[in-house]
Design a protein with these regions (language model features):
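Helical scaffold of the NTase/Pol beta-like nucleotidyltransferase catalytic core
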Residues: 1-110
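Catalytic metal-binding acidic patch
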Residues: 114-139
Length: 140
């Protein structure tokens, strides 16, 4: 799983980074700013994605002078699915925490490191986890 861009699991196109960018902000943004926040594609490509998402109702657009401002439509029936995909990394760590909490002998510490901790890995990245057992604890 790509923990840096979790939406790519189901949305491998430019739509994924655009939806993720809008999910991570609650304020209206211009097409140019959406492109910057998405960090992918071209500005014109992002504008095409935004227009299509507006057409489907996932994004709301309003005019502000000559600019068009875009904001996620969090009331859309599909928006919780977008949020779920955007938050996959958080869900991964929450599940890891639950599993570790269920161990009969709790660890002294558990640390995620590397690209998974930074949130910048890709499909080729591993999930670096350091588990330190308490002194005299049982072996795993």
């Amino acid at each position: 799983m790509d923990v840096a861009r979790p939406l790519t699991v189901l949305v491998p196109s430019l739509d994924g980074p655009v939806l993720e960018a809008l999910a991570r902000t609650s304020r209206p943004v211009t097409g140019r700013e959406a492109h910057r926040l998405a960090g992918a594609g071209s500005e014109s490509g992002v504008r095409l994605v935004l227009a299509r998402l507006v057409e489907h109702g996932l994004v709301n657009a309003t005019q502000a002078g000559k600019a068009t401002l875009y904001v996620a439509n969090r009331e859309h029936i599909a928006w919780p699915l977008v949020e779920g995909l955007v938050n996959l990394r958080r869900e991964l760590f929450a599940r890891m925490g639950k599993l570790i909490a269920a161990w009969s002998s709790p660890p002294a510490t558990v640390t995620v490191f590397g690209s998974a901790a930074r949130g910048d890995g890709g499909l080729d990245s591993d999930l670096g986890v350091l588990v330190v057992r308490p002194a005299g604890g049982e072996e795993v």
